């Protein structure tokens, strides 16, 4: 099992210094989410081959690996120009992963919930173009349902991934999305079975609680989604239940601490999350 850190809260650390900083926080693995000087959100990668080589050397020197790259592109459109651009961005990102020796990439479906049929059609078109590249480079792709996407429910995401019917494609369970994707960690984890290879760990409040008034959004009836990525214990996700389900399912993949809420105390949060993950892994009660 790998325990990784998503270093988004410390993304302002220079890229070549990042591995040593992550090592100091007690992690041996980085799940590298978007950052402006590497692979930014929804735009073409900003890094050249020389910097990729230097980054790989810095990782080796620090004794830290990249568990996964996590790019986010609009490969499900629904706009066709956006989809084609996303495929170009993906192509370069896959090459970067290969040059780093990374064998895992993670992403979302990245379509629109108000256009689910069009988004899914665009997703399949992109998969037809990109799956051969993943195969050629020996890279796996792990997908997660996300709030405000054309697939938000965990069971629906698993069914779609099964429909892809490819050994390189698997499922990610994101704990801070629990209350958006079905609020059924044990059921979703069991249903995923061997398709579950990655888990994101952070806490969140149940936005459906208190008759939907845990949060009050304006204007009334807005379709906006709300969630958090908090330290474990600060929200309402049942982590005892979640880790119990992972044990029952024989999970042996990658656990990633992905707290985004506390940039002002990012070091303390990252250290705390590493400790809590170890506690849950050793607690068999």
What residue spans do the PLM features occupy?
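Acidic/histidine-rich catalytic cores of soluble enzymes
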Residues: 2-5, 29, 66-69, 128-236, ...
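Conserved, mostly hydrophobic/aromatic
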Residues: 5, 22, 30, 59, ...
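Short, acidic/polar
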Residues: 12-22, 84-95, 181-189, 239
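Active-site acidic/histidine proton-transfer and metal-coordination neighborhood
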Residues: 16-17, 58-62, 75-173
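Catalytic domains of carbohydrate-active enzymes, especially glycoside hydrolases
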Residues: 18-36, 101
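Glycine-rich, proline-tolerant flexible connector loops at the mouths of alpha/beta enzymes
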Residues: 31-59, 110-115
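A short, acidic, flexible beta-alpha connecting loop/helix-capping segment that sits on the rim
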Residues: 254-269
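C-terminal helical cap(s) of enzyme catalytic domains, especially alpha/beta-barrels
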Residues: 266-285
């Amino acid at each position: 099992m790998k325990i990784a850190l998503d270093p988004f809260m410390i993304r302002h650390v220079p890229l070549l210094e990042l591995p040593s900083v992550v090592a100091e926080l007690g992690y041996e693995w980085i799940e590298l989410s978007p950052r402006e000087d590497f692979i930014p959100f929804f735009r073409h990668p900003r890094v050249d081959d020389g910097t990729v080589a230097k980054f790989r050397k810095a990782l080796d020197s620090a004794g830290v690996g990249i568990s996964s790259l996590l790019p986010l592109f609009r490969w499900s459109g629904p706009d066709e120009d956006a989809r084609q651009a996303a495929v170009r961005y993906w192509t370069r990102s896959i090459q970067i992963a290969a040059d780093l020796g990374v064998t895992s990439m993670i992403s979302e479906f990245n379509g629109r919930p108000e256009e689910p049929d069009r988004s899914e059609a665009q997703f399949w078109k992109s998969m037809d173009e990109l799956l051969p590249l993943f195969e050629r480079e020996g890279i796996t792709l792990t997908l997660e349902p996300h709030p405000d996407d054309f697939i938000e429910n965990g069971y629906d995401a698993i069914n779609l991934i099964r429909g892809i019917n490819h050994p390189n494609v698997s499922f990610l369970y994101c704990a801070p999305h629990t209350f958006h994707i079905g609020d059924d960690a044990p059921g979703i984890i069991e249903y995923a079975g061997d398709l579950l290879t990655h888990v994101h760990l952070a806490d969140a409040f149940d936005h459906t609680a208190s008759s939907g008034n845990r949060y009050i959004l304006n204007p009334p009836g807005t379709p906006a989604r709300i969630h958090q990525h908090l330290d474990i214990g600060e929200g309402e996700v049942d982590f005892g239940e979640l880790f119990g389900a992972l044990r029952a399912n024989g999970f042996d993949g990658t656990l990633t601490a992905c707290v985004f809420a506390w940039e002002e105390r990012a070091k303390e949060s990252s250290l705390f999350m590493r400790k809590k993950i170890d506690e849950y892994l050793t607690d068999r009660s």
